[in-house]
UniProtKB/Swiss-Prot annotation:
<keyword id="KW-0732">Signal</keyword>
<dbReference type="Pfam" id="PF10530">
    <property type="entry name" value="Toxin_35"/>
</dbReference>
<dbReference type="InterPro" id="IPR019553">
    <property type="entry name" value="Spider_toxin_CSTX_knottin"/>
</dbReference>
<feature type="disulfide bond">
    <location>
        <begin position="51"/>
        <end position="68"/>
    </location>
</feature>
<keyword id="KW-1015">Disulfide bond</keyword>
<keyword id="KW-0800">Toxin</keyword>
<protein>
    <recommendedName>
        <fullName>U1-lycotoxin-Ls1j</fullName>
    </recommendedName>
</protein>
<keyword id="KW-0964">Secreted</keyword>
<dbReference type="GO" id="GO:0005576">
    <property type="term" value="C:extracellular region"/>
</dbReference>
<keyword id="KW-0960">Knottin</keyword>
<feature type="propeptide">
    <location>
        <begin position="21"/>
        <end position="41"/>
    </location>
</feature>
<feature type="disulfide bond">
    <location>
        <begin position="70"/>
        <end position="84"/>
    </location>
</feature>
<feature type="signal peptide">
    <location>
        <begin position="1"/>
        <end position="20"/>
    </location>
</feature>
<dbReference type="GO" id="GO:0090729">
    <property type="term" value="F:toxin activity"/>
</dbReference>
<comment type="similarity">
    <text>Belongs to the neurotoxin 19 (CSTX) family. 04 (U1-Lctx) subfamily.</text>
</comment>
<feature type="disulfide bond">
    <location>
        <begin position="58"/>
        <end position="86"/>
    </location>
</feature>
<dbReference type="InterPro" id="IPR011142">
    <property type="entry name" value="Spider_toxin_CSTX_Knottin_CS"/>
</dbReference>
Amino acid sequence: MMKVLVVVALLVTLISYSSSEGIDDLEADELLSLMANEQTRKECIPKHHECTSNKHGCCRGNFFKYKCQCTTVVTQDGEQTERCFCGTLPHHKAAELVVGFGKKIFG
Protein backbone atom coordinates (compact mmCIF):
# COMPACT_ATOMS: atom_id res chain seq x y z
CA MET A 1 0.00 0.00 0.00
CA MET A 2 2.86 2.36 0.81
CA LYS A 3 4.41 1.79 -2.62
CA VAL A 4 1.13 2.79 -4.30
CA LEU A 5 1.00 6.05 -2.31
CA VAL A 6 4.59 6.86 -3.24
CA VAL A 7 3.91 6.20 -6.94
CA VAL A 8 0.71 8.33 -6.84
CA ALA A 9 2.57 11.16 -5.09
CA LEU A 10 5.33 10.96 -7.69
CA LEU A 11 2.80 11.08 -10.54
CA VAL A 12 0.99 14.06 -8.99
CA THR A 13 4.32 15.87 -8.62
CA LEU A 14 5.30 15.18 -12.23
CA ILE A 15 1.90 16.28 -13.56
CA SER A 16 1.91 19.50 -11.53
CA TYR A 17 5.47 20.27 -12.65
CA SER A 18 4.67 19.71 -16.32
CA SER A 19 1.48 21.79 -16.10
CA SER A 20 3.37 24.64 -14.40
CA GLU A 21 5.85 24.66 -17.29
CA GLY A 22 2.91 24.79 -19.68
CA ILE A 23 1.52 27.77 -17.79
CA ASP A 24 4.93 29.48 -17.96
CA ASP A 25 4.94 28.92 -21.73
CA LEU A 26 1.47 30.46 -21.97
CA GLU A 27 2.59 33.45 -19.91
CA ALA A 28 5.59 33.91 -22.21
CA ASP A 29 3.30 33.78 -25.26
CA GLU A 30 0.99 36.36 -23.67
CA LEU A 31 3.97 38.59 -22.91
CA LEU A 32 5.15 38.38 -26.52
CA SER A 33 1.62 39.19 -27.69
CA LEU A 34 1.47 42.24 -25.41
CA MET A 35 4.85 43.41 -26.66
CA ALA A 36 3.66 43.05 -30.27
CA ASN A 37 0.52 45.07 -29.45
CA GLU A 38 2.66 47.78 -27.85
CA GLN A 39 4.86 47.91 -30.95
CA THR A 40 1.76 48.22 -33.13
CA ARG A 41 0.49 51.03 -30.93
CA LYS A 42 3.77 52.91 -31.39
CA GLU A 43 3.56 52.55 -35.17
CA CYS A 44 -0.03 53.79 -35.52
CA ILE A 45 -0.86 56.97 -37.43
CA PRO A 46 -1.68 59.97 -35.18
CA LYS A 47 -4.71 62.22 -35.59
CA HIS A 48 -4.60 64.63 -38.57
CA HIS A 49 -1.74 62.68 -40.25
CA GLU A 50 -2.03 61.11 -43.68
CA CYS A 51 -3.31 57.53 -43.88
CA THR A 52 -3.73 57.14 -47.65
CA SER A 53 -1.36 54.16 -47.82
CA ASN A 54 -2.54 52.52 -44.56
CA LYS A 55 -6.26 53.09 -44.05
CA HIS A 56 -6.53 50.80 -41.01
CA GLY A 57 -3.47 52.11 -39.14
CA CYS A 58 -4.96 55.05 -37.24
CA CYS A 59 -4.29 55.37 -33.50
CA ARG A 60 -6.87 55.36 -30.71
CA GLY A 61 -8.28 58.61 -29.39
CA ASN A 62 -9.61 59.21 -25.88
CA PHE A 63 -12.65 56.97 -26.35
CA PHE A 64 -12.66 55.71 -29.94
CA LYS A 65 -10.17 54.67 -32.59
CA TYR A 66 -9.58 57.37 -35.19
CA LYS A 67 -10.94 56.56 -38.65
CA CYS A 68 -9.22 57.17 -41.95
CA GLN A 69 -11.31 59.80 -43.74
CA CYS A 70 -10.72 60.30 -47.46
CA THR A 71 -11.46 63.15 -49.86
CA THR A 72 -10.92 63.56 -53.58
CA VAL A 73 -8.50 66.34 -54.48
CA VAL A 74 -8.40 67.83 -57.97
CA THR A 75 -5.01 69.20 -59.00
CA GLN A 76 -4.46 72.16 -61.33
CA ASP A 77 -3.85 69.66 -64.14
CA GLY A 78 -7.36 68.25 -63.62
CA GLU A 79 -6.14 64.98 -62.10
CA GLN A 80 -8.18 63.54 -59.27
CA THR A 81 -6.31 61.96 -56.39
CA GLU A 82 -7.54 60.56 -53.13
CA ARG A 83 -6.04 62.00 -49.93
CA CYS A 84 -6.83 60.51 -46.53
CA PHE A 85 -6.19 61.56 -42.93
CA CYS A 86 -6.90 60.08 -39.52
CA GLY A 87 -9.68 61.87 -37.71
CA THR A 88 -12.62 61.59 -35.37
CA LEU A 89 -16.01 60.83 -36.91
CA PRO A 90 -18.74 63.43 -36.18
CA HIS A 91 -20.85 61.11 -34.01
CA HIS A 92 -17.73 60.13 -32.04
CA LYS A 93 -16.98 63.84 -31.50
CA ALA A 94 -20.52 64.32 -30.21
CA ALA A 95 -20.18 61.36 -27.83
CA GLU A 96 -16.85 62.68 -26.52
CA LEU A 97 -18.42 66.12 -26.02
CA VAL A 98 -21.34 64.66 -24.05
CA VAL A 99 -19.03 62.55 -21.89
CA GLY A 100 -16.73 65.54 -21.26
CA PHE A 101 -19.72 67.71 -20.36
CA GLY A 102 -21.06 64.99 -18.06
CA LYS A 103 -17.70 64.72 -16.30
CA LYS A 104 -17.67 68.48 -15.68
CA ILE A 105 -21.19 68.44 -14.23
CA PHE A 106 -21.04 65.23 -12.19
CA GLY A 107 -17.37 65.48 -11.33
